[in-house]
């Protein structure tokens, strides 16, 4: 069922979203034989220093590039360099490209801004997809934060763009610790045909833990029920109407607050 939902051939199971991201990047580097990871400004990909350099972390990794989303200069960089193994995207950034996700400090700040332009972000992802394909760069969607909130097929379905690898996390396990990587079969192999002994390991004592797998099965079973399928069919209309109604009430009461949403 994960193959069907993600549209990918192979699956691996881990114990957290961060581990899933680490494995996806590791496999991308292994198969492309390139060194560099590209992430986008302010995007959250867990606590691994390679995907989250900054304050409170060790010195920024030399093999991580932080670029801007929805920027032609980023595509130019991807086309000009020969050492980029993968680009990782957190689709929740569609609400606030190149700005940080909400946290305690920003939620208390009246200067917080967000807004979603689905068509513009989808167009950006399509251009990014085309550039990655052209340059042999692995495109990774990190869907751990968005889960399956946007669509039954996740952000790939919602934005109409197919990534080479996708990571999922806590949503699948109903809150239990889980990380999942779905990807093309050629990228998910732990060995290379020309050097079969050069293995790309991904070990974990609790990977695919039976308790977590059972919780995941319960979630996927629920996803297949008719009421949930019906809910997904009306998701955009439902949340557009709710947001409009809520924003009208905020406006009527003279409150300088508006809500932004994706789905």
What are these regions (language model features)?
Residues 2, 24, 37, 64, ...:
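Buried hydrophobic positions in well-ordered alpha/beta secondary-structure cores of metabolic enzymes
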Residues 90-122, 136-159:
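Conserved PLP phosphate-binding loop immediately N-terminal to the Schiff-base lysine helix
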Residues 31, 129, 134-135, 253:
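Helix C-cap/helix->beta junction micro-motif
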Residues 3-116, 237-240:
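PLP-dependent aspartate aminotransferase-fold enzymes
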Residues 226-263:
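Conserved PLP-dependent catalytic core of the aminotransferase class-I/II
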Residues 204-235:
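Structural motif of enzymes handling amino- and sulfur-group chemistry
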Residues 11-18, 41-44, 145, 167-173, ...:
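Active-site nucleophile and cofactor-binding loops and adjacent substrate-binding regions
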Residues 159-191, 208-215:
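Active-site PLP attachment segment
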């Amino acid at each position: 069922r994960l193959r069907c939902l993600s549209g990918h051939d192979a699956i691996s199971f881990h114990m957290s979203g961060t581990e899933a991201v680490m494995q996806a990047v590791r496999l991308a580097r292994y198969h492309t034989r390139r060194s560099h990871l590209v992430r986008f400004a302010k995007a959250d990909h867990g606590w691994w220093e390679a995907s989250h350099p900054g304050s409170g972390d060790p010195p920024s990794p030399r093999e991580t590039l932080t670029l801007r989303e929805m920027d032609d200069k980023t595509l130019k960089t991807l086309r000009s360099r020969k050492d980029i193994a993968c680009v990782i995207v957190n689709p929740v950034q569609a609400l606030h490209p190149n700005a940080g996700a909400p946290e305690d400090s920003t939620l208390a700040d009246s200067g917080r801004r967000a807004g979603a332009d689905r068509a513009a972000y989808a167009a950006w992802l399509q251009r990014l997809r085309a550039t990655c394909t052209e340059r042999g760069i692995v495109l990774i969607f990190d869907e751990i934060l968005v889960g399956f909130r946007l669509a039954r097929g996740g952000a790939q379905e919602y934005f109409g763009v197919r990534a080479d690898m996708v990571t999922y996390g806590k949503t699948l396990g109903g809150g239990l610790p889980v990380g999942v990587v779905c990807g093309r079969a050629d990228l998910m192999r732990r060995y290379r045909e020309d050097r079969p002994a050069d293995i790309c390991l991904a070990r974990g004592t609790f990977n695919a833990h039976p308790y977590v797998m059972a919780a995941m099965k319960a979630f996927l079973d629920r996803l297949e029920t008719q009421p949930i399928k019906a809910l997904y069919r009306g998701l955009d209309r439902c949340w557009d109407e709710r947001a409009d109604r809520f924003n009208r009430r905020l406006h009527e009461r003279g409150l300088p607050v508006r809500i932004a949403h994706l789905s």
